[in-house]
């Protein structure tokens, strides 16, 4: 889908890999170097990209649990101080990411695409409306979607008898697309493969 958007909008695709970024300043400098009117900025698998994007609510629960499980006040204070030091080691922060996306890189017509398999672990501030204008879930394909993919890929309608034997909501769009590509010289075999 990203390639299709790139082709349609005549924009280059730039992948931003947060794991390779040392701190907020480096992120800001990278985004400043990108012409957002000619670019699609992609943060792929953002749930795995950095601890900075994970929900703060879970982090706070973990810290509270660790601190309240100990009985000694002095031990609690030492543990809390150590946890704060560990958190500061990561110089790429959620605040830096949000400010970079909203401020420096904020320009009319920008396209930023984030992909994730686990949106529930992301901090709500990262995916709130206004920051992320559209969320699209790619669930498993029903028969209609498989038929449309087949038609778009091969330029002809799928055999309705074979199509009716394909289980619905089992295969991801990526899986179906891969089969269509694998059987490009024998299209009907792609459908037969999906019936098994």
From Swiss-Prot:
Q: Where does ATP bind?
A: 32-39
Q: Which InterPro entries match?
A: ATPase_AAA_core (IPR003959), ATPase_AAA_CS (IPR003960), Mitochondrial_chaperone_BCS1 (IPR050747), P-loop_NTPase (IPR027417)
A Gene Ontology molecular-function term?
ATP binding
Instruction: Enumerate the PROSITE patterns for this protein.
Output: AAA
Which Pfam family is an annotated match for this chain, by its short name? AAA_lid_BCS1
Keywords in alphabetical order: ATP-binding, Nucleotide-binding
State the family it belongs to.
Belongs to the AAA ATPase family.
Name recorded for this polypeptide: Putative AAA family ATPase L572
Native species:
Acanthamoeba polyphaga mimivirus (APMV)
């Amino acid at each position: 889908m990203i390639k299709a958007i790139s082709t349609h909008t005549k924009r280059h695709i730039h992948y931003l890999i947060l794991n390779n970024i040392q701190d907020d300043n480096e992120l800001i400098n990278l985004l400043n170097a990108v012409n957002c009117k000619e670019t699609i900025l992609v943060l792929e698998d953002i749930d795995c990209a950095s601890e900075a994007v994970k929900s703060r609510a879970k982090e706070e629960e973990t810290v509270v649990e660790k601190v309240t499980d100990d009985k000694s006040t002095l031990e609690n204070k030492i543990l809390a101080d150590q946890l704060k030091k560990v958190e500061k080691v990561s110089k790429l922060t959620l605040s830096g990411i949000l400010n970079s996306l909203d401020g420096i890189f904020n320009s009319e017509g920008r396209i930023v695409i984030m992909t994730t398999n686990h949106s529930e672990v992301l901090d709500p501030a990262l995916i709130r409306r206004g920051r992320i204008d559209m969320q699209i879930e790619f669930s498993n394909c029903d028969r209609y979607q498989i038929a449309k993919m087949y038609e778009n890929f091969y330029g002809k309608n799928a055999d309705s008898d074979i199509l009716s034997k394909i289980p619905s909501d089992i295969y991801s769009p990526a899986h179906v697309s891969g089969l269509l590509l694998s059987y490009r010289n024998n299209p009907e075999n792609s459908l037969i493969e999906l019936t098994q």
